[in-house]
Amino acid sequence: LEGVNLSIDRGTNYAIVGQSGSGKSTLLKLMNGMMTPSKGSIKIDYLTPNMNNKKFKKMMHTIGYIPQSLGLVKNISVMDNILIGALPRLNLMQSVLKQFPENEIQEAKNILKLVGLSGKESRKAYMLSGGEKRRVAIARALMQKPTILLADEIVSELDHVTSREIMDLILDAQKKMNLTAIMVHHDMKLALEYANRVAVIKEGQKILEIGVEGDTIVDFQTGDLSIEEIMEMHNTDPKE
């Protein structure tokens, strides 16, 4: 990454779009403190995301992170996978899952309902469909009670209908929980459909930023590329 300058307002649904290897996932890892920039800086609520920063470590649970791999534990139940999300917030170890506070179990049930998985609490994660696994990953992140949700290619390899179901779910959770959502996509059309702002990353540099209101592009900032060329990069018809 080089010369990437992003300013993301609280409550925004912000999409980062780019082809494989462009640096999108690296950006998310920098935001949650998993990586440290060799140059430049990142601030979240005036704090630098760094595991050595004690103040940042205390507020880490406010950043929900969904990796592209989803990170589910395959041989445990949906409920236990979701409860794992609360462990950092409660400063507990995974070994206490069976003695979890009743109020947290009720909160997990509420979130299961929010993500459309009520009645599947005891099902093992490996038995779930691709869309269901993503719902569990979202629920686990929401159990952290975050203010920021980072999601890396959350709908990759899903069909058109399931992709939009998952995106609708995230939008619903964002509104109900007052979240800032920062999501990595490779699909420009999907990003424009759901995000308030879209940044396009190419070879580690931001080459475009778009502001979106409804179906209208209200702000278009770019260097050398036209919007038609950007759309063509991502196999999207700008007329659609």
Sequence positions of predicted segments:
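H-loop/switch region of ABC-family ATPase nucleotide-binding domains
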Residues: H185-H186
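Catalytic Walker B motif of ABC-type/P-loop ATPase nucleotide-binding domains
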Residues: L149-D152
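Conserved ABC ATPase "signature" region
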Residues: S95-G119
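The feature captures the beta-strand-to-loop junction immediately N-terminal to the Walker
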Residues: V17-Q19
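Conserved ABC ATPase signature
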Residues: K124-L128, E132
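Conserved ABC transporter NBD signature motif
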Residues: G40-N50, M59
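Helix-to-loop junction immediately C-terminal to a conserved catalytic motif
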Residues: N32
